Amino acid sequence: MPETKDLILRKAVLTDWQDMLRNIWSHAESAKYMVWSTTETEEAAIARTERTIAYQAAHDYHWTVVEKASGQAIGWAGMEQHSDGVWGETGIAIGPAFVGKGYGTQLLNCLTDYARDQLGAKRFVACCNSKNQASRALQLRCGFTFTHTEEVFHPRDQITYTLEHYAKEL
């Protein structure tokens, strides 16, 4: 189970629903640049947690993020293999009350270190919506360099946006 100084990455459990609803899922600002919608009710949060548990069970490198100090589930982080020796993040998200504490940096560095040390990755890639200045700054702060942009259509919102791609040699 990967961890950082302040965070534990573990598989979701059903009791996470309250923390996740309170800390991230109900916050529109957290979903603004992501490919997910907010969750508003307890019933929806329980159902979403059940889907998360099933998804994480089928994907070895997708985790719920827990703050060590409080024991609360505050977000998620994941990665997947793109090709031989190349791994990439599939999303990092933490609730707004936990932003500005260095947790994003810890998470992205944790993923890259885990990919290199445990999975033999030689390169790690990440991306963000071009309007997401915080994600761009995070990737640059963690030593990633810009590689290219891509226009992406988002079917739920019926919009096209620019995705910026970054990479880091490990």
Q: What are these model-predicted stretches?
A:
Residues I24-W25, M34, Q56-A57:
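Hydrophobic residues in alpha-helical segments
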Residues T52-T64:
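A short helix-loop-beta-strand connector motif used in the catalytic cores of GNAT acetyltransferases and
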Residues E29-R51:
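Conserved GNAT-fold acetyl-CoA-binding loop/helix
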Residues R51-T52, Y114:
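A generic secondary-structure signal
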Residues M1-D19, N23-E29, H62, V66-L170:
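Acyl-donor (CoA/ACP) binding surface of acyl/acetyltransferases
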